[in-house]
């Protein structure tokens, strides 16, 4: 198949060779001539193939079609079900446009982006009046406000929670807000002080609105690079280089990956809060809550970023950044009975058992507030806030291994009267003490009903029951009449098991002592005591 036009030189040579008579050559067309280009075979094939495809939907189905449709089917291409479905799918995730037109929606979205960009350039004390500071967890990094840093590179945009306007506004639960503004414990700038007086009613309104939603979410994740190294000699819990200028009612965050200050509110040290503070902080013993000394935060600022930081990751890449102590400690160890803390060697000191009676501030080396069991917090709330209810160090209520502790083994049993918290020097004494807690009423009669001694020894081994005998001092008197050998499962609760415990109709179901529960760790006493010594990774 020849791709050259009829007037080319190849046709002339073929005709002269076939007929033998010379033929006058035709005038040769230039290669770029339109007539010659139109006769080329690829152009012809493309025209033939595209002649009957005008009625099909174009790939760009959302674009306006040509003004001269090839076929009448193309007239309703925008109204076809496939095109409507494609348009609907393309609108998923977009905000609802106003009823006027799409052009207005585009311009309004552009204006809202400008407004958010303008508000991001404002400082904390200069927020506009129309901003109600609602909690926006999905706000982008550009929409969060910039912190007013003292140094040049000390402030940066940080995606986090929106803070109520003004960095020094009073917490609504604390009394006398006007005295809080003029207290010497707040190193606010003059600009922030002026804006505070103007915006105090709005700050109270916004703060109360936000705290009604969730009191634990009214905190800001601030980023400052110079707050760790610069510490002043004041007695207030802030340093002079901190941008947010938090008052004495705010506690430094227990975030191991980034130094700085979070804004979860607590009462100042002058206010004698007894027991727990508000809902989310009920798990904290009252003697640690009232204040933190910023000169004692060496563990938060220096030790934890080096020891707990993940290798190869920047300090701000952790999901725990800026978190409050409950989520931080549950993220590190999700077990409420966790017996060790793998940085405990930095925490131990020779005077650890003598520094627990000061409710105003934590002593040196103990800036962290460890969460305790909820039952223990109830017991601590009922007890005096000045005299701790624990014989040992109250930060380590569940057997934290201190290197200089002469009696490191602590009983973790919690009942209605509070935690036991007795200390023992050896694990054998602790296990012998645990058997007094786990003794079932009438256990001697229960074990005496079985003929084989192997079953009784296995039950006393796994359930920590005392050996059967009439003179056993640990057993409690009581009637325990059970009909099936499944009664050994009395100490455990099986949610999916069948009800094997059938009692006679005249006898009530025997139960454990009132108010106490069976500790799952009583079965693993040896493992726990050895794990606390080994670090329990």
From Swiss-Prot:
Assigned GO CC terms: cytoplasm; nuclear matrix; nucleus
Chain intervals with Low complexity compositional bias: 149-158, 221-232
Protein name, as recorded: Zinc finger protein 703
Skewed-composition ranges (Polar residues): 101-111, 176-185, 205-220
UniProt-listed PROSITE patterns: ZINC_FINGER_C2H2_2
Any GO BP annotation: negative regulation of homotypic cell-cell adhesion
Gene name in the database record: znf703
Basic and acidic residues composition bias: residue spans: 188-203
Cellular localization per UniProt: Nucleus; Cytoplasm
Function: Transcriptional corepressor which does not bind directly to DNA and may regulate transcription through recruitment of histone deacetylases to gene promoters. Regulates cell adhesion, migration and proliferation. Involved in specification of the lateral neural plate border (NPB). May be required for segmental gene expression during hindbrain development.
Family: Belongs to the Elbow/Noc family.
Zinc finger (C2H2-type): 409-437
Single GO MF descriptor: zinc ion binding
Keywords for this protein: Cytoplasm, Developmental protein, Metal-binding, Nucleus, Repressor, Transcription, Transcription regulation, Zinc, Zinc-finger
InterPro entries with a match to the protein in the record: Elbow/Noc_ZnFinger, Tscrpt_rep_NocA-like, Znf_C2H2_type
